[in-house]
A protein has these predicted regions:
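Membrane-proximal intracellular helices of multi-pass ion channels
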Residues: 2-183
Length: 183
């Protein structure tokens, strides 16, 4: 009954997009939660798209360590390397930026509500396959945006980052550190 429906709503947005309910019946809050679940995909080694659960765990652990004023983020008795934190932050920022930018382009191009467009872009970048039913009516620009997001979501953020930066040469010297106030 309802327990199976709840499990389905938690698992479906993070995997293959098999759908058992009409998503257009979701409230705005339900759509927002589904968007978040589509962006946070499965674990490493799985075929699920989206941000890996370990990426989110690294970011949450780092945030908690920052709030507690700890020098390093620790998880399961191990220190998380700064490069891992940088990669997690970069990939997460890329996913969120692409999803929001794509949603904005589609919303402006089609005159549709932003939340509806974000639902479609999160599904594309997370390679989930869920839809609110607007995709067949989209113009060429909007469909092209979704195709590019699907490609990014399938190939993966880190792969594209390394491919784009592989020709960059490493600098031998290091610049001095600067303390920047963030808030």
């Amino acid at each position: 009954g309802s327990e199976m429906c709840i499990r389905d709503r938690a698992v479906t947005p993070r995997t293959a997009g098999f759908n058992t309910v009409d998503l257009t019946d979701l409230s705005e809050a339900g759509q927002f939660i589904t968007i978040a679940l589509m962006l946070i995909g499965g674990s490493p080694g799985s075929t699920a798209g989206g941000l890996k659960t370990t990426t989110i765990a690294v970011l949450l652990t780092t945030a908690i360590s920052t709030f507690r004023r700890r020098e390093n983020a620790n998880l399961f008795g191990r220190r998380i390397d700064d490069d891992v934190v940088k990669n997690a932050a970069t990939i997460s920022l890329m996913y969120i930026t692409l999803c929001c930018t794509g949603g904005l382009i589609i919303s402006v191009s089609e005159g549709l509500p932003m939340l509806t467009c974000l639902f479609e872009t999160a599904s594309a970048v997370g390679t989930v396959g869920l839809s609110l039913g607007i995709t067949p009516e989209l113009n060429l620009l909007s469909r092209s945006v979704l195709i590019l997001l699907m490609f990014f979501g399938r190939v993966g953020g880190l792969t594209l980052i390394f491919a784009a930066l592989s020709s960059a040469q490493k600098k031998v010297s290091k610049l001095p550190k600067e303390k920047i106030t963030v808030g």
